[in-house]
Structure formats: C-alpha cells, structure tokens
C-alpha cells in the first residue's frame, strides 16, 4: 500500500507498507514525483512498514529522483522524518548526506511527528 497525504499545515505523509500490492513500486515512484513537484514548502514524514523492497529498476529510479530533485528539496523541504520498524541500519547517515535540511530515522510515527514539530517553520 502506498499513500501520499497532505495533512494540516505543511506536513506531507508518505506511507509505503503492508499489505503490499503489485503496483506499489510504481505508486511509490509516482508519490516521489508528486513530492518533488510540490511548489509550497513542506515537512515530510515517510512511514515505511515491513521490509518491502524496490526492484533494481525501482532503486535506480529512486536514486535518479534524489539527484534530479535535490535542489528543489533543499529549497522547499524543511525537515524529513523516516519511520522504519526494527533496526534502521545506516539510514540516517545515508539520507543525512543527501540533503542539508534536518533528517532523522525514528522508531515510531509519534517520534517522527515530534521531530518534525520541533523544527522551525519555513
């Protein structure tokens, strides 16, 4: 299941988790495109449930999106909280190198929301 929701204020929430469906990878990549095209400033909460994986082609598309949208993300995203179950590995380090805005990897959605709420407004 993939969902991109605009919540109150400037918060965008991207959800990618079970139950997984055949079109999830395309929906996830489409959600990234929608985030990259957003004109208004925002904070992003990315909630990943389970251990769904992208195909090699999906990984490549995601990496190209990171490169293509870097300047726009720097200009409009004020912070990113990534919620991952279990051991996040090096996620915070990897994503923190992509952008200069604040990035955290949280164990729960509540922790991610608290991090975003503590960031200064745009």
Where do the model's predicted regions map?
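Amphipathic, Lys/Arg-enriched alpha-helical "gate/interface" segment within cytosolic domains
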Residues: 1-122
